[in-house]
């Protein structure tokens, strides 16, 4: 996840009760297939009458989900994973011999993401609440430092230059105010969701807030700073709106003991040897009713191997898919979609500390924020034995992440310690002594994902959303970039379920149209 990860999360919006949000607008972003897919996740697709060989490229949540469904249906499945672990953009950082851990990728699950919760439950894992907001945390903007609770009570404390009609409103309230025109179009003009989505697909987030939302530049800056939107203001407004609606959920959860347990449980549920790690797929050759996949192995005496299957599912990121050599080449439209879709950058900086110094401020969970390079600081919801603690000392996206990625690790830690000291009003040297261990993850530099999560720029929804999910002959595609909303484990799972269902439908259709040929080929 970001995956979808990660949860990967796209905005850090202050809590907005979903009951306060326009229900018609929320419905525009609901997937009409979702409940059917939830039943598929629970019951599977049944036993296939014709067993096929299927290769899945990529052992992230999309690939593992599809592999599990197809495996349970009776197909012979092989999963090729280029890296040395499963999970993709689910990555839990652990250190041998210690009990603490922290998420470098996906780290939260919205309460409405029932598919993810279903797979967590079926894997025998537990959930606990992830606290996104805490009134005791700090906000440091424009040289002014206040606790979140004080800013909620008086948003003008932060000193943004806004119009009189925008004063004493939170960034969240200002963003919601900008949506009035869309809400009116849905309710008064009887515009369809598709009409609204098509109309506003051309707007960047900043363009919409100024031209349609009629907000002042000061209000736009406030939204960008506090809601983590400024570094991606050039991205599509409809993506920002999708993220805003999700972050209005009443509750988020995390997997007790670490998110990496989920993909590992899916992998363990497959037959031994199904998932091949350190197996980088290089080429996909379609020939008649067969698909041949050539991949690298870890065996120096046989550096490359070849598998033949009836179907192939490409469950990598769009960027990683471009490294595959397809023969015959993919359609020009597919190539354009894979090449053009925008990915966010995302960076996380982890500090492990001998003492949970943030608890001196009565901070347990939640996040602090600043306009400094560190941007967002997340405090752990899980407590480990003793006084030790681990903190996500910086979480940045888009241009903020690119800034971090240009620095070497030591310089990054120095920059983050500067911001952490300012936010907590402590000396940098004290924090350096308290937090001697660090780790840095740049998803934009990851050689396997090659990016954080997909996030459309203007026009990309209309241009690429359907094309990204369209199969090419016997080659299918899955991943959080293939479905909506981008950047979530749930979306990766959803795309994997849809792909598995489509492959099974193709098997059924072939067996109906040409039963003798199907029977012979499947042997």
Stretch-by-stretch model annotation:
Residues 180-283, 287-300, 308, 315, ...:
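Active-site/ligand-binding neighborhood in enzyme catalytic cores
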């Amino acid at each position: 996840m970001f995956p979808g990860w990660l949860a990967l999360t796209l905005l850090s919006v202050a809590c907005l009760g979903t009951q306060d949000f326009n229900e018609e607008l929320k419905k525009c972003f609901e997937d009409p297939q979702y409940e059917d897919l939830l039943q598929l996740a629970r019951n599977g697709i049944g036993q296939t009458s014709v067993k096929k060989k299927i290769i899945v490229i990529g052992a992230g949540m999309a690939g593992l989900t599809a592999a599990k469904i197809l495996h349970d249906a009776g197909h012979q499945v092989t999963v090729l994973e280029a890296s040395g672990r499963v999970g993709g953009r689910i990555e839990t950082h652990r250190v041998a011999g210690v009990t603490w851990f922290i998420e470098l990728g996906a780290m939260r699950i919205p309460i409405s993401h029932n598919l993810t919760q279903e797979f967590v439950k079926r894997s025998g894992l537990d959930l606990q609440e992830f606290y996104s907001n805490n009134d005791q945390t700090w906000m440091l903007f424009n040289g002014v430092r206040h606790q979140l609770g004080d800013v909620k009570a008086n948003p003008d404390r932060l000193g943004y230059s806004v119009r009189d009609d925008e004063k004493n409103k939170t960034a969240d309230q200002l963003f919601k105010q900008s949506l009035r025109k869309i809400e009116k179009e849905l309710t008064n003009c009887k515009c369809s969701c598709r009409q609204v989505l098509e109309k506003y697909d051309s707007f960047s987030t900043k363009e919409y807030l100024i031209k349609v939302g009629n907000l002042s530049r000061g209000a736009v800056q406030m939204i960008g700073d506090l809601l983590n939107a400024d570094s991606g203001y050039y991205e599509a407004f409809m993506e920002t709106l999708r993220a805003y609606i999700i972050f209005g959920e009443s509750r988020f959860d995390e997997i007790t003991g670490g998110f990496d347990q989920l993909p590992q449980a899916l992998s363990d549920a497959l037959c031994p040897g199904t998932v091949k790690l350190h197996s980088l797929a290089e080429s996909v050759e379609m020939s008649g009713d067969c698909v041949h996949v050539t991949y690298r192995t870890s065996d120096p005496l046989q550096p490359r191997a070849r598998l033949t299957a009836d179907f192939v599912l490409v469950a990598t990121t769009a960027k990683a898919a471009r490294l595959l050599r397809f023969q015959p080449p993919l359609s020009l439209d597919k190539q354009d979609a894979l090449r053009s879709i925008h990915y966010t950058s995302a960076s996380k900086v982890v500090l492990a500390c001998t003492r949970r110094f943030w608890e001196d401020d009565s901070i347990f969970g939640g996040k602090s924020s600043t306009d400094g390079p560190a941007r967002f600081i997340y405090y752990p919801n899980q407590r480990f034995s003793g006084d030790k603690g681990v903190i996500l000392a910086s979480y940045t996206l888009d241009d903020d992440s690119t800034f971090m990625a240009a620095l070497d690790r030591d310089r990054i830690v120095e920059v983050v310690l500067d911001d952490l000291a300012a936010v907590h009003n402590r000396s940098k040297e004290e924090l350096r002594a308290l937090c001697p261990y660090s780790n840095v993850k740049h998803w934009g530099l990851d050689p396997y994902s090659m990016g954080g999560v997909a996030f459309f720029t203007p026009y990309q929804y209309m241009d690429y959303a359907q094309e990204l999910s369209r199969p090419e002959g016997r080659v299918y595609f899955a991943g959080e970039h293939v479905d909506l909303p981008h950047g979530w484990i749930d979306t990766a799972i959803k795309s994997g379920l849809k792909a598995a269902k489509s492959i099974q439908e193709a098997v059924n259709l072939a067996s109906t149209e040409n039963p003798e040929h199907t029977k012979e080929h499947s042997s």
